[in-house]
Amino acid sequence: MAVSVPGYSPSFKRPPETVRLRRKRSRDHGAAVPASLPEPAPRRAALAAGLPLRPFPTAGGRGGAAATIARRNPFARLDNRPRVSDEASEEPLRGPQGASGPLLDSNEENNLLWEDTSSHERTGTELSQSQRVSLSESDTWSSDGTELPVDWSIKTRLLFTSSQPFSWADHLKAQEEAQGLVQHCRATEVTLPQSIQDPKLSTALRCAFQQALVYWLHPAFSWLPLFPRIGADRKMAAKTSPWSADETLQHALMSDWSVSFTSLYNLLKTKLCPYFYVCSYQFTVLFRAAGLAGSSVITALISPTTRGLREAMRNEGIEFSLPLLEEIGHKKKVRDPSLESEEEQAVSDEDEEESFSWLEEIGVQDQIKKPDVISIKLRKEKHEVQMDHRPESVVLVKGLNTFKLLNFLINCKSLVATSGAQAGLPPTLLSPIAFRGASMQMLKARSSNVKTQALSGYRDKFSLDITGPVMPHALHSMSMLLRSSQRGSFSAGLYAHEPTAVFNVGLSLDKELDRKVAREDLANCGLHPKTLEQLSQRPVLGKSSLRSVEMSDYILSWRS
């Protein structure tokens, strides 16, 4: 017969004695613990150093008032509660221009997603998330007197503000509108006085403004937004595209597009067109005539690119360079000459294949584990793949290779999307002058005024909003017009199409360009002489573009 043991229950369903004993142990243990525990030495040192620590765990028990030593939480050392006062004190450190957009670090910039949306339709939250700042972008203002640095990026929006009204830009008369179009087609040079007393009564100013808004586009469909093309699938999703499922119509569109593209290149080659853009759903190409950007030959920049596109260009015999990678590599060598060991490592990688053949000769290739050919190739191409779709992937083509690039783009099957909202739609051609098959388009301009709070009450603030594909010549023309109409005082916010910001990268030139001769050769390209002089300068902005411009007393300052 089994002997019953006090506190033991064979069924383990109702162990009353066990529970009673545990409660008794807890009371006895709590009585032996002092009411206040001394703080550990590391905690005292941290408090002396001024670290914000949580209160030291006090004694407490599970059984009502019984006291037990609470186990320490290793993750609760620092006070991670939000501190409003600290965040408020850090806000002024961003400077007076800090509210225009957040400055992102280099990692966020490298993970840049180029999905462009119309800036005037964005909310404040969307705008702060979409504005991306390149690595060379700074929050300091630079001044170069009376001229801006050349900016080859395409702007999607210009927002000018001034203490003087922009009413002169509204409701142009029929005669002024017609005269402005004629001035554009005939490339009439307009010279305005330094200051216009009554801009609304100045016919020359209003005609010049109409002239500056004109640009040329192919193809043109009034119901379809054709710029920007990168990341525009969402905008085009609800639009009608009759060519998406009609191969005959797609072939006709591509045939007309090839004729227009060839016409533009011929105008560029004969220096009758200064530059033009090819905007596809994957990348953008900038063709520049000889004499612009400090180059004595025709240049073409492509951004962003992928390893597949670069490999296809190599297979077609197109010689190109990666200017940003060359610039970064040169800076690294200047800072650290020991980087030559990396080149030696690359040479050793090439010798690996020879070592494998030597193993086969001595007959031990099966006994030694070696990487396969695919692994070796992937390791060599790792760095090249990592820069795909990034600003560092920008490609520069110069001289006669630009003609090869022309033929490559015309025959490239991946130039046109095969599915999605842009299926079957040829790339967009943008040019400052007319070309075969082009359609004349106008930038949209709208002026308004708001009340802003000042020390003495409220004052009027006037704004001029220009939207559309604003090319470099249009930005310079607008700055010259506003210099006269706003009496040398205005500010501007510039919104760039991010894939084109990298077009401001500097070029490695074989010889110095005679800018005077270049301007004479391009005298018939359709641009104002002052605009042509600015575009002939070498780019200095690098991967960034102009973000803000301010003119005060006819002195320009800018921020990139």
Swiss-Prot record:
Disruption phenotype: Early embryonic lethality. Heterozygous mice show no overt phenotype. Residues 1-140 are annotated as: Disordered. One of its GO terms (biological process) is DNA replication. The keyword Nucleus applies. Residues 34-53 have a biased composition (Low complexity). Its main location: nucleus. Keywords: Developmental protein, Nucleus. InterPro entries: Donson (IPR024861). One of its GO terms (cellular component) is replisome. Residues 125-140 have a biased composition (Polar residues). It is found in: Nucleus. The keyword Nucleus applies. Replisome component that maintains genome stability by protecting stalled or damaged replication forks. After the induction of replication stress, required for the stabilization of stalled replication forks, the efficient activation of the intra-S-phase and G/2M cell-cycle checkpoints and the maintenance of genome stability. Belongs to the DONSON family. Component of the replisome complex composed of at least MCM2, MCM7, PCNA and TICRR; interaction at least with PCNA occurs during DNA replication. This is Protein downstream neighbor of Son. It comes from Mus musculus.
